[in-house]
């Protein structure tokens, strides 16, 4: 065997070297391809992750749970901001009497405001405590029977024809929500005086209603109908026997014996302004309660009309209605033709027009919708007779109608005549 030459050996070495280089190149390409594939996979994974993140973020935003609580949170923030922006001064920091407020009001209104002794040193919180009259359902109360359809005059004032039976305006205690008691006691006393031949006026005790009527809360307020029921059942002592104190600690006194008490016969409810006016014309003042707006506290004169955006108290205040009228358009009261009610208040003669106020009709202040008539024995008897007359007239009319229906028809037509001839 002939040995390989040196050239052959070198050629083989070169061939092996080239093969190694080729394998290395192939391996390098494989590594590069693998790296590219990994990079591509990483990019694809990253893009998928981004898409998934965006999708998850969108789904989170539309999740009803987060939407609900997010909405509630926004509403809460809105309420807090609005409360902060519209913070109101507490009522116990706002005085009833304010000269600056009076000046602003009086410069642009037909009715005027002013100071009065009753509200000196008082705040709107104090006033709110006095508006404590409440109302029960009227479904079980007697409706007044108002006879007659006589024309209601344009104006009427019970004070003009019954001056001898007019009590002075009550000045109730500033701390006592007893307007319902003072209105009932003074109304009954005046009506009894108006009915009497000698026109003798005997003031009656409002304090008895405040101290002795357990169905109400005394100086903390009460129901007008409860006080009227007490007055009918138990009667009222005279003011001389049980004088007005208007305090929370005033005790019920047994010193005023039953024979000394005055009782009305009953009471009834008047519905609507026409019935209220006819009752006042015939029998005297009536008792009602009104919604009170803050600007009414400082009323001085003119025809009161509640202001725009003026707050009102949540309770009611009891008053007496004594008449009505129409503004004549004088210089001081230029609201010509404006119809109004005349009411008697219980804040003293220094308030309003000597304790009275003119209130524009149709303001929905509640008192003109219905009122109470305190019925004396004489008034009750007159009402009974009126009802009997009405029932008798209705019965006679029904009988007459029945007789008319029973009369045979004597006006025969031609067919009837022909049918009767043989």
Residues of each region from the PLM?
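N-terminal targeting leaders characterized by basic, low-complexity, disordered sequences
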Residues: 1-41
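Acidic-residue sensor for enzyme active/binding pockets
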Residues: 6-8, 43-46, 189-190, 208
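Alpha-helical segments embedded in low-complexity/disordered contexts
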Residues: 11-15, 19-22, 47-50, 63-67, ...
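Intrinsic structural disorder/low-complexity segments
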Residues: 15, 21, 35, 43-44, ...
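Low-complexity, intrinsically disordered tandem-repeat tracts enriched in small/polar residues
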Residues: 29-35, 42-49, 395-398, 415-420
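Juxtamembrane low-complexity tails/linkers enriched in Ser/Thr-Pro and polybasic
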Residues: 44-60
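Catalytic-core signature of thiol
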Residues: 64-65, 72-422
């Amino acid at each position: 065997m002939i040995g390989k030459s040196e050239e052959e050996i070198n050629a083989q070495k070169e061939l092996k070297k080239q093969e190694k280089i080729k394998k290395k190149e192939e391996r390098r390409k494989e590594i590069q391809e693998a790296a590219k594939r990994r990079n591509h996979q990483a990019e694809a994974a990253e893009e998928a992750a981004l898409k998934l993140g965006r999708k998850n973020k969108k789904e989170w935003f539309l999740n009803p749970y987060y939407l609900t609580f997010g909405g509630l949170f926004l509403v809460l923030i809105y309420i807090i901001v609005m409360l902060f922006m519209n913070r109101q001064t507490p009522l116990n920091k706002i005085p009833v009497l304010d000269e600056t407020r009076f000046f602003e009001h009086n410069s642009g209104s037909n009715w005027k405001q002013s100071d009065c002794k009753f509200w000196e040193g008082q705040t709107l919180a104090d006033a709110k405590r006095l508006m404590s009259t409440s109302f029960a359902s009227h479904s079980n109360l007697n409706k007044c029977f108002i006879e007659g359809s006589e024309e209601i005059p344009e104006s009427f004032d019970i004070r003009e024809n019954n001056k001898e039976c007019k009590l002075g305006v009550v000045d109730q205690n500033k701390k006592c929500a007893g307007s319902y008691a003072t209105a009932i006691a003074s109304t009954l006393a005046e009506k009894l005086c108006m009915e009497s031949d000698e026109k003798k006026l005997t003031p009656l005790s409002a304090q008895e209603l405040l101290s002795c009527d357990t169905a109400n809360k005394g100086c903390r307020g009460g129901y007008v109908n409860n006080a009227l029921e007490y007055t009918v059942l138990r009667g009222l002592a005279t003011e001389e026997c049980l004088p007005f104190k208007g305090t929370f600690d005033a005790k019920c006194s047994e010193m005023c014996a039953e024979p000394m008490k005055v009782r009305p016969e009953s009471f009834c409810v008047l519905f609507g302004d026409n019935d209220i006016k006819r009752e006042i014309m015939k029998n005297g003042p009536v008792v009602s309660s009104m919604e009170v707006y803050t600007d009414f506290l400082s009323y001085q004169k003119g025809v009161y009309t509640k202001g725009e955006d003026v707050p009102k108290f949540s309770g009611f205040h009891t008053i007496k209605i004594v008449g009505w009228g129409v503004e004549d358009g004088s210089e001081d009261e230029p609201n010509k033709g404006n119809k109004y009610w005349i009411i008697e208040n219980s804040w003293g003669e220094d308030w309003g027009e000597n304790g009275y106020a003119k209130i524009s009709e149709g303001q929905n202040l509640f008192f003109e919708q219905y009122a109470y008539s305190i019925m004396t024995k004489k008034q009750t008897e007159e009402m009974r007779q009126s009802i009997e007359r009405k029932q008798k007239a209705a019965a006679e009319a029904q009988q007459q109608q029945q007789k008319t229906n029973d009369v045979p028809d004597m006006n025969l037509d031609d067919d009837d005549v022909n049918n009767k001839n043989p």
